[in-house]
Regions:
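Hydrophobic alpha-helical transmembrane segments of multi-pass integral membrane proteins
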Residues: 2-12, 29, 70-84, 105-115
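Helix-coil boundary and interhelical linker segments in multi-pass alpha-helical membrane proteins
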Residues: 16-23, 89-97
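Hydrophobic alpha-helical membrane-embedded segments
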Residues: 26-39, 113-119
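Membrane-water interface of transmembrane alpha-helices
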Residues: 36-49
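Alpha-helical transmembrane segments and their immediate juxtamembrane interface regions
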Residues: 104-135
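Single conserved hydrophobic/aromatic residue that forms the stacking wall/gate
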Residues: 141-150
Length: 150
């Protein structure tokens, strides 16, 4: 059996089991890559703008931390999927049937929005004009995220 057949079978299986979340995970992965690359580019621009300040510029430590954070996103989404599965399986015992739940879907969309805002912030760091209202939304999101992290 060829690798293409195996990959096609796996994609079909995951698509059937995860539904729309499968496609959103694909979009999230693309956003994660774009965010990482735009963060590297923004750091490079800042290093050029501040050549004498070592606090600016790309850092492998920050890069590794960013990758670890993105992997942690996937872990949290996996936990949401497990909780969805448990709710679906136990709902029948409780006397009602749920065809699916949305916890993993909501978590995935939340992380997609987080990545999109981060890409926007990176564009602003590179000097791209960003609408003021969008930066306000981004700042509000950042403050809420910091509050949740504490």
């Amino acid at each position: 059996m060829s690798i293409q057949v195996c990959v096609t079978g796996l994609v079909a299986y995951l698509s059937q089991k995860l539904g729309v979340t499968f496609y959103l995970l694909g979009i999230l992965l693309c956003l994660m890559v774009i965010d990482y690359l735009s963060g590297m580019a923004a750091s490079a621009v800042e290093a050029l703008d501040h050549p004498d300040d070592k606090s600016y510029g790309w850092s492998s430590r920050k890069g590794a931390k960013g990758i670890a954070k993105k992997v942690a996103y996937l872990f949290v989404i996996a936990v949401g999927m497990v909780i969805d599965y448990v709710i679906i399986q136990t709902s029948g015992v409780l006397g009602f049937n749920l065809p699916n739940t949305m916890l993993s879907l909501l978590v995935t969309v939340w992380y997609m929005l987080n990545e999109a805002l981060s890409i926007t912030e990176n564009a602003g760091r590179m000097g791209a004009p960003v609408p003021e209202w969008l930066m306000t939304v981004s700042y509000t999101h950042l403050r809420a995220h910091e509050t949740l992290s504490d």
